Amino acid sequence: MNKPLIFAVFIVVIAVFFLVLNFNNLKTVMNPVQISVNDSSVPPILIKVALLGDLHLDEGKKVFDKFAMLIKEIKSHNPDLILLVGDYVTKPSKIKDITQHRKNVINAFKLFDPIPRAVVLGNHDNWTDGDAWQAEFKNLDVDLLENKSQIMNVAGRQICIRGFGDNWSHKFKYIDYPDECKDMPKLTITHDPQGAFELGVEGLVFAGHTHCGQVSFPIIGPLKVPSKAPRQAICGLYKDSKRTLFVTSGVGYSLLPLRIGTKSNWDLIDLSF
């Protein structure tokens, strides 16, 4: 066998390997997570949280049929709370009718009923008229926590949930937890994990945005991450003296249907206080 042929076979084998790897990485799977928060002011509680972000949904019935199946799968695990952390639509230039697409996305979120849900916007949502998103959420009676907080009844207990606007699209505005949340379990949701490192932010935070790099290699890590968050805080669980942050890898992808070293997933979190 001559050298050019050997080289060609090698290239084909490598290409097939990466195609199969990419195909598997794009298949959305459940990622089990356990997080424990030490807060002596809060009576002990254990809740099951489903975290979902970076859907990047395109238009079309097939896309929403597939999303409905994902919602059915998530509900089958009986979570007590759904957290949706932004980037619900694909690249703005690919969307033909954003008004209808926006309605379809928000109506799809209603399939999570009767499970309590908390929602914030991501940069893709803000780039497709964040004000219109906020208005449509209100019109369709779905609560949106953009720089505000809400007390929710979760698993028979009151939970204080705070939402921050996306830092990457300059919508972040710091708000403190209200006084009535003092003795309640508290958590924050936002899109860009940098929001967890803004002045005054402490405690438990959930975020998305990074896709865990989408393309990430051993040793060198992600090639590029659109966030100012510390590099060690762009994927999965991060803890320091002020905060506990969990960043989901997300469901979808940006630019190309490509994931190397990262997986499409949603997270099922056993959360204890």
What are these regions (language model features)?
Residues 139, 193-273:
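Conserved beta-sheet core of the metallophosphoesterase superfamily
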Residues 13-99:
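N-terminal active-site segment of His-dependent metallophosphoesterases
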Residues 36-50, 142-143, 150-162, 182-183, ...:
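Beta-strand-turn-beta hairpins that frame and shape the catalytic cleft
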Residues 135, 139-142, 148, 154-190, ...:
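Binuclear metal-dependent hydrolase catalytic cores centered on His/Asp/Glu-rich metal-binding motifs
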Residues 51-67, 89-100, 125-129, 219-230, ...:
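Acidic/histidine-rich helix-loop elements
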Residues 66-153:
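Core catalytic region of metal-dependent phosphoesterases/phosphodiesterases
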Residues 51-53, 81-87, 117-123, 145-148, ...:
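Active-site neighborhood of phospho(di)ester-bond hydrolases with catalytic His/Asp-centered motifs
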Residues 1-14:
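N-terminal Sec-pathway targeting helices
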